[in-house]
């Protein structure tokens, strides 16, 4: 059956030539990102458990995970959590298969602890956090969808959005958080995982504002704190120079009051220890960024089942399509993908698969159009590949 694939030329100023561009990334220790990470870790663990015990992924969604902030007393050289962070794993899961009960809550709790242990390395899981699990049972109608031996049927009438390639600013913002928390943190353990990077490009001038919770036990005093934040600034300036020749100004923890020694210190590395709650889907989109200059879906991607939940599959799929078009089709400057499903219809037959392309100057759009159609059709023909990639942990969702 022919697919409704529409590729059109977009008469719009390319992102790099627009006057103003804004890009944001919430770091992996931001309360919203922790919620995303927990939800996705639980979903992937349930997928593996279902495959092992049942031979296939059964119905589940864990995309309602919530974090309620605790209270803490951070200080130079130490500090303590006074009231633990409360983390609630919420959603639906299939708890019985062919008459046998499945230990879904135990699987979820183990996955959550493992995720926190590997991500929030300064969080004491015995003292600093309470993890609770409330997984209901999915409806029989939805569970039946997973039993059909064919391409899964869409769970909803919804859409997914993706774009490529990353702009200079998008690359800078994304990689600043990643490199600060991997490369620089390996030498400066005081850097907390709770970090926000906000990028502004005004013409050829880029401003990066970094908000980073430092971990008190690794910071001896105010002078040490100042030296560390200055090193973060210098590191980021050098990193940004790899991606752009534009002017870059970096600002770190601009809310600090150095005269009053009032600075951004934490005990665990996340502001969830003191006043900041978190929810799934309030942070980064599945490409790892928040990009108001680009089309975006407001759907949470993390925690949704990877079989037929359009909010997950089509956002991931559209992003992969866009990236492959840029890789495989010459002379594409910007590409935007939108996929729209119809509830109950096969996910490889979207109501429309739309690509809007800004070609490079002097390019024949007819050639670009036909090649882009092939990429889109090929991905839709192999749509379940996204499911396999998610279960194997090959695709990030935030």
From Swiss-Prot:
GO BP terms, alphabetized: one-carbon metabolic process; S-adenosylmethionine biosynthetic process
One family name in Pfam for this protein? AdoMet_Synthase
User: What's the Enzyme Commission number for this chain?
Assistant: 2.5.1.6
Q: Which InterPro entries match?
A: AdoMet_synthase_2_family, AdoMet_synthase_3, S-AdoMet_synthetase_arc
Give the reactions, separated by semicolons, that this protein catalyses: L-methionine + ATP + H2O = S-adenosyl-L-methionine + phosphate + diphosphate
Q: Which residues bind ATP?
A: 136-141
Q: Would I find Iron among this entry's keywords?
A: no
Domain of life of the organism encoding this protein: Archaea
Give the EC class as a word: transferase
Q: In which pathway does it act?
A: Amino-acid biosynthesis; S-adenosyl-L-methionine biosynthesis; S-adenosyl-L-methionine from L-methionine: step 1/1
So which cofactors does this thing need? Mg(2+)
**What is the protein's given name?**
S-adenosylmethionine synthase
Q: Which organism is it from?
A: Methanosarcina mazei (strain ATCC BAA-159 / DSM 3647 / Goe1 / Go1 / JCM 11833 / OCM 88)
């Amino acid at each position: 059956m022919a697919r409704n694939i529409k590729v059109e030329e977009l008469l719009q100023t390319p992102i790099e030539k627009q006057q103003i561009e804004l890009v944001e990334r919430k770091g992996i220790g931001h309360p919203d990102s922790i919620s995303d990470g927990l939800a996705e870790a639980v979903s992937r663990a349930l997928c593996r458990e279902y495959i092992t015990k049942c031979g296939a992924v059964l119905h589940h969604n864990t995309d309602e995970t919530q974090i309620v902030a605790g209270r803490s007393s951070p200080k130079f050289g130490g500090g303590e959590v006074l009231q633990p962070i409360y983390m609630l794993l919420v959603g639906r899961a299939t708890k019985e298969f062919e008459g046998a009960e499945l230990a879904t809550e135990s699987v979820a709790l183990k996955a959550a602890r493992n995720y926190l242990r590997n991500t929030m390395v300064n969080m004491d899981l015995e003292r600093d956090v309470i993890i609770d699990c409330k997984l209901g049972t999915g409806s029989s109608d939805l569970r039946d969808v997973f039993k059909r031996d064919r391409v899964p049927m869409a769970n909803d009438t919804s859409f997914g959005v993706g774009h490529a390639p990353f702009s200079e600013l998008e690359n800078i913002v994304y990689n600043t958080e990643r490199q600060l928390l991997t490369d620089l943190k390996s030498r400066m353990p005081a850097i907390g995982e709770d970090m926000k990077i906000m990028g502004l490009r005004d013409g050829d001038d880029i401003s990066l504002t970094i908000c980073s919770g430092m971990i008190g036990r690794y910071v001896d005093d105010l002078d040490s704190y100042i030296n560390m934040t200055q090193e973060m600034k210098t590191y980021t300036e050098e990193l940004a120079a790899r991606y752009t020749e534009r002017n870059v100004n970096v600002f770190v923890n601009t809310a600090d009051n150095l005269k009053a020694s009032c600075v951004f210190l934490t005990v665990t590395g996340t502001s969830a220890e003191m006043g900041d709650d978190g929810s799934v889907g309030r942070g980064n989109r599945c490409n790892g960024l928040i990009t108001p200059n680009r089309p975006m879906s407001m759907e949470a991607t993390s925690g949704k089942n990877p079989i037929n939940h359009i909010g997950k599959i089509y956002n991931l799929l559209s992003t992969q399509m866009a990236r492959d078009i840029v890789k495989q089709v010459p002379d594409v400057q910007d590409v935007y993908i939108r996929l729209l499903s119809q509830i109950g219809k096969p996910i490889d037959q979207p109501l429309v698969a739309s690509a809007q392309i800004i070609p490079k100057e002097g390019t024949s759009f007819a050639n670009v159009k036909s090649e882009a159609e092939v990429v889109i059709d090929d991905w839709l023909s192999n749509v379940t590949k996204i499911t396999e990639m998610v279960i194997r942990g090959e695709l990030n969702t935030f």
